[in-house]
């Protein structure tokens, strides 16, 4: 994720150095992954007034729900079952996400999780690292 440090002044008062970061949106996925911006699924767990909720940022949740139902209903020790899951999700991205979350002792992981996929025949779910402070 690209960022640029900047000095922030509000009404003449210095507020320190802040990092301006790219936003995870359809333009980010288009520019960084060459994904069609109108054909992505982007989901996030976020805090809302009623608690932490799974929200649709772009696209739909149907492919994700299908994958989760499959995971919950099948035994991943079966090589054929595991092979199907590998077709749906980028396993390395998921592992990287878990390792980074644990290594950084990210305490806000419960409400700061995002993942996305290009809505194509071979589009796999990939996880994003957000808000490690």
Where are these regions (language model features)?
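Zinc-dependent metallopeptidase catalytic helix centered on the HExxH motif
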Residues: 11, 100-133
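A broad, low-specificity signal marking well-ordered, structured residues that form hydrophobic/aromatic
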Residues: 6, 18-19, 40-41, 113, ...
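Short, well-structured beta-strand/strand-turn elements
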Residues: 1-7
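ATP-dependent phospho-/nucleotidyl transfer catalytic cores
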Residues: 13-15, 19-106, 119-120
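Short beta-strand or tight-loop elements
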Residues: 4, 96, 111
């Amino acid at each position: 994720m690209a960022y640029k440090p900047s000095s922030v002044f509000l009404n003449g008062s210095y507020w320190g150095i802040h990092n301006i970061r790219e936003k995870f949106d359809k333009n980010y996925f288009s520019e960084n992954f060459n994904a069609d911006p109108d054909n992505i699924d982007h989901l996030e767990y976020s805090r809302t007034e009623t608690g932490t909720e799974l929200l649709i940022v772009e696209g739909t949740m149907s492919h994700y729900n299908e994958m989760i139902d499959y995971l919950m209903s099948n035994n991943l020790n079966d090589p054929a079952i595991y092979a199907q899951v590998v077709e749906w999700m980028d396993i390395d991205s998921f592992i990287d996400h878990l390792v980074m979350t644990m290594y950084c002792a990210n305490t806000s992981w419960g409400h700061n999780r995002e993942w996305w996929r290009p809505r194509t025949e071979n589009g796999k779910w990939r996880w994003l690292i957000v808000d490690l402070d």
